[in-house]
Amino acid sequence: KSCCPNTTGRNIYNTCRFGGGSREVCASLSGCKIISASTCPSYPDK
């Protein structure tokens, strides 16, 4: 599961993933976090 701070971050993450980037790289680029829990710790998943 990925958690992003805002819609822009989510869009960057999704575009990066669609382009073939790894979850770790895309999360780093977009400011998102990859977590194993089902809910995001510090901000809602949009």
UniProtKB/Swiss-Prot annotation:
GO terms for biological process: defense response. Gene3D superfamilies: Thionin-like (3.30.1350.10). GO terms for molecular function: toxin activity. SUPFAM superfamilies: Crambin-like. It is found in: Secreted. The keyword Disulfide bond applies. InterPro entries: Thionin, Thionin-like_sf. Disulfide bonds join C3-C40, C4-C32, C16-C26. Keywords: Disulfide bond, Plant defense, Secreted, Toxin. One of its GO terms (cellular component) is extracellular region. Thionins are small plant proteins which are toxic to animal cells. They seem to exert their toxic effect at the level of the cell membrane. Their precise function is not known. Belongs to the plant thionin (TC 1.C.44) family. This is Viscotoxin-A2. The gene is THI2.3.
